[in-house]
């Protein structure tokens, strides 16, 4: 085995990855493809207004080398951190892999953050520079000024921006020496309960997620075209839209626009991905669009936008999107309600493969699989990972017993940035405490109960907010729901539901206010389908739910 080699043995499950003494991930994910004859193949396609823009593997390798040289020429050195506030575009690939190849540590963060939070991350990360898309200057520039760390701003523009330095740089760049266990990049957690946390990852972490999940579970290969509505700046999107397609020599489809039913359906129709990665909120909104088209064309009946590419014209000229290129639909970020699974399959003929991952684990470690799906379940353990459920007494729970999910695998972070007290509570003896409550059934399927701090004790019995939310979402009037505990006049905790409707409420239904009528209907709906103690005592109709940039509901804000 050469010092830079990586060998993969797929004769067993999970596949075995064996590294040489040195391994710089950029060489494997970028340079390897040119060496293996894929230089002329399209690595990246851009959707939306940039739909004609493509980048081949040879052009990717050149762009990565130029970006790495430009960063070194601007004074960054191996080990320095480079914060990235960059939209989903080829430059994200160039600077992420260019930094890694040069020995610099890229740190992608959400471009939806405000200056205050960006300033915190600039200071917390100790980054030497921030590379950013020009449309985010309104937050990045004041964040840099407020942080007062001396970090340099590098705007992705020509004529005075960092793209001038890239254009002038040499494309050939030798990979900086690195070992498999060296830190390659950082991410920041989405912060469901407070300030984001810096999460370092090693060179070996990305191959583990790609081989165990992308190949081992999804079966991705060189012919696949991966499109992720979830963006590159967090772990789920980083895998879906970058490391997965580059691992197998496939094609990444990028869309810098905010994902909506209109933009995602347009991208699927025009660029024909084979694998689509979304989140439950977006699947719900897409279904709402499909339902509207179906209602406008009642004579057509059956599925709309099905895997076979059927087209249905509505009375207003609208038609169902052609989803015929898709063979895989994946969901993560929040648990997928079983009714969403059933409705999506009925409407499109496609199953949604629900799974759970985390920033700390880099991607999905429990998942449903093609042809092996249990609606309402998160799935079974991805080969290459271990999972256990631990009760409040610290003892591993048996089948049917609830507790906190802990996982272990080759992609989990070695620790946190500047958070030793959190690290000691979260990573114990190699086990990562996820903070999620789960039940595992006798067949090994894992069933989500909610975040540990979101569980509600009603009448002395723990109940899962997810079960109540899933029941509410079975009602045709409900688009989204979030349930928290609230004290009543007697100081007893009962469920409170915050509900986003599919259509605005009318003022009245007969002589009764519409809100009161629908509240009574939803309460009765829950009482019919849940144990009686679990029904929501209050229902609040809201325009939207508070969420992180990754789509996770921030229930702590609803409890405030």
For each predicted feature, which ranges?
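Conserved AMP-binding/adenylation subdomain of ANL enzymes
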Residues: 207-225, 235-275, 284-301, 305-306, ...
């Amino acid at each position: 085995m050469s010092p830079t080699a990586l060998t993969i043995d797929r004769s067993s499950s999970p596949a075995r990855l064996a590294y040489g003494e040195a391994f710089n991930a950029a060489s494997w994910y970028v340079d390897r493809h040119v060496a293996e004859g894929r230089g002329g193949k399209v690595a990246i396609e851009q959707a939306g207004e940039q739909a004609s823009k493509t980048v081949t593997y040879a052009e990717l390798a050149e762009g990565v080398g130029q970006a790495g040289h430009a960063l070194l020429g601007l004074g960054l050195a191996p080990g320095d951190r480079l914060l990235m506030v960059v939209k989903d575009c080829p430059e994200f690939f160039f600077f992420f892999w260019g930094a890694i190849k040069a020995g610099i540590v890229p740190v992608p963060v959400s471009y939806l953050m405000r200056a205050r939070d960006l300033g915190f991350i600039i200071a917390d990360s100790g980054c030497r520079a921030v590379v950013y898309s020009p449309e985010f200057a309104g937050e990045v520039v004041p964040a840099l000024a407020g942080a007062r760390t001396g970090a340099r701003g590098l705007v992705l523009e020509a004529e005075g921006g960092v793209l001038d330095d890239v254009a002038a740089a040499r494309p050939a760049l030798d990979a900086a020496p690195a070992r498999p266990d060296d830190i390659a990049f950082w991410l920041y957690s989405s912060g469901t309960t407070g300030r984001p946390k810096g999460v370092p990852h090693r060179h070996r972490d990305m191959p583990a997620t790609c081989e165990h999940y992308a190949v081992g579970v999804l079966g991705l290969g060189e012919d696949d075209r991966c499109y992720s509505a979830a963006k590159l700046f967090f772990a789920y999107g980083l895998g879906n839209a970058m490391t997965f397609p580059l691992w197998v020599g496939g094609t990444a489809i990028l869309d810098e626009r905010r994902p909506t039913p209109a933009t995602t359906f347009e991208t699927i129709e025009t660029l024909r991905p084979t694998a689509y990665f979304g989140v439950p909120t977006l699947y719900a909104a897409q279904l709402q669009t499909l339902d509207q088209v179906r209602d406008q064309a009642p004579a057509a009946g059956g599925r709309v936008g099905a895997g076979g590419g059927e087209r249905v014209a509505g009375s207003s000229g609208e038609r169902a999107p052609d989803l015929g290129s898709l063979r895989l639909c994946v969901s993560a970020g929040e648990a997928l309600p079983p009714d969403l699974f059933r409705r999506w399959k009925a409407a499109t003929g496609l199953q949604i493969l629900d799974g759970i991952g985390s920033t700390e684990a880099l991607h999905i470690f429990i998942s449903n699989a093609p042809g092996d799906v249990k609606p309402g379940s998160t799935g079974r353990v991805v080969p290459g990972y271990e999972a256990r459920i631990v009760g409040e007494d610290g003892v591993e729970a048996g089948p049917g017993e609830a507790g906190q999910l802990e996982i272990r695998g080759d992609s989990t972070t070695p620790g946190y940035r500047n958070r030793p007290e959190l690290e000691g509570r979260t990573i114990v003896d190699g086990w990562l405490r996820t903070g999620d409550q789960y039940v595992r059934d006798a067949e090994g399927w894992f069933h989500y109960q909610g975040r540990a701090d979101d569980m509600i004790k009603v009448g002395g019995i723990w109940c899962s907010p997810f079960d109540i939310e899933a029941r509410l979402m079975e009602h045709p009037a409900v688009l989204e729901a979030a349930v928290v505990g609230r004290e009543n006049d007697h100081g007893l905790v009962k469920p409170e539901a915050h509900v986003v409707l599919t259509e605005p409420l009318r003022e009245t239904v007969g002589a009764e206010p519409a809100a009161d009528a629908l509240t009574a209907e939803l309460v009765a709906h829950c009482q019919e389908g849940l144990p009686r103690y679990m029904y929501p005592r209050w229902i609040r109709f809201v325009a939207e739910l508070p969420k992180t940039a990754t789509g996770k509901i921030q229930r702590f804000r609803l409890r405030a």
